[in-house]
Every structure is written in C-alpha cells, then in structure tokens.
Amino acid sequence: MEVHNVDLTISAVSDEQYPKTNIPEIALVGRSNVGKSSLTNVLINRRNFAHTSSQPGKTQTLNFYDVEDKVYFVDVPGYGYAKVSKKERERFGKMIEQYLTQREQLRGVIQLVDARHEPTPDDVNMYNWLQYYNIPTLIVGTKIDKVKRSAWNRQLSLIKKTLDVESSTPIILFSATEKKGKDDVWQWIEERMGKN
C-alpha cells in the first residue's frame, strides 16, 4: 500500500477514547523494546513517527495510528517488563485483554518476537492466548539483520518450535534497517483489511 498520510489519532488510556470508526485495525504486540515502533515506522515510510523508546515499558497507552484512513495500526503496551507497578500492569492487562477480545474493528494481531533469541515464556503465553481466542495472528521475527544469514533457518525453526506455531500462523523475518520483510507484512495486513 502506498502510504503518504499517517496520523496518531489518540493515545488511549480507556476504551471510551478508542476511535469511533469502522476502519479495520491491526494490533501490534510484543515484549518491550522488541521493535514495534521500528516496524511501524518502516511500514508507514517514516523515520521517527512512532516513537522508539530507550526505556522499556514506557508505552502505557494504546496508540492508534490512522494510515491513509484505510487501516489503524494499534501499538499495544509492551509485555514482560517489570518497571511498571503491579496495579498498573493489571489495569493495562485488563484493558488490552478487552481490546483484543471485544473490539469489532480488530482484524488481526502482529506478534513481534526477537529473532536473535528463543521466544520468552511471555511470548509463548501471548501466542497461546491469541490462538485460544482465535485471533488471526502474524508472527514477525525482528532484528534479523543481527543474525548471520546462515543461521536464519535455525532461528525460524526455534521460533516455530518454542511457540508451537500452528500451520495457519505465518512467520516473517524482519529487519528495520534493511526493510526486509516489509512487503510480506503489508501483504498480510492488506489481506486482513478486507475481512470482517
């Protein structure tokens, strides 16, 4: 998709603030600092539009990015980071769960995992949870440029095995610096945009 117009519509802290539109939404989930902002920036052809934070766990809102009035990218707070208070974590956990299970406009979830390492227990729990609720999921292995090309297949197998990936779940290896995987991610998003 050609992208020229992108707006951060709202950084929502409650469901009353979610955009009241019928535009399809794609949520991005993953551990703190896994590269959600970098993926968003590459997909929308901007360098620093989605803010990349050096402080993990900083995003504590659902950020709705309106892309060409055709799709919203929804940046979900990173999981698996302990610097936020337990009470705050529980509040956001509940909000995220409600968004992912009840939001009619949601067409699918992109789950990002760090391709350099074995997926964490938090990654496994998130994937299992998404599958339990039958939410269409794309796994994106980030930072693949930091892995030797000869080891890509090994890392791909590790992700598949650790997450116990279902055959219906595609996996794409992605590099923000080389823009590898960008077109494949967009293809999946566009396929989801047309589905109710």
Swiss-Prot record:
Function: Necessary for normal cell division and for the maintenance of normal septation.
Swiss-Prot/TrEMBL cofactor(s): Mg(2+)
One Gene Ontology biological process: division septum assembly
Protein family membership: Belongs to the TRAFAC class TrmE-Era-EngA-EngB-Septin-like GTPase superfamily. EngB GTPase family.
Stored InterPro entries: G_ENGB_dom, GTP-bd, GTP-bd_ribosome_bio_YsxC, P-loop_NTPase, Small_GTP-bd
Family annotation (CDD domains): YihA_EngB
GO molecular function, one term: GTP binding
GO cellular component entries: cytosol
Binding positions (Mg(2+)): 37, 59
One Pfam family from the record: MMR_HSR1
Keywords (A to Z) from UniProt: Cell cycle, Cell division, GTP-binding, Magnesium, Metal-binding, Nucleotide-binding, Septation
Annotated binding of GTP, by residue: 30-37, 57-61, 75-78, 142-145, 174-176
Segments forming domain EngB-type G: 22-195
Protein name: Probable GTP-binding protein EngB
Gene3D superfamilies reported for this sequence: P-loop containing nucleotide triphosphate hydrolases
Membrane spanning stretches: none
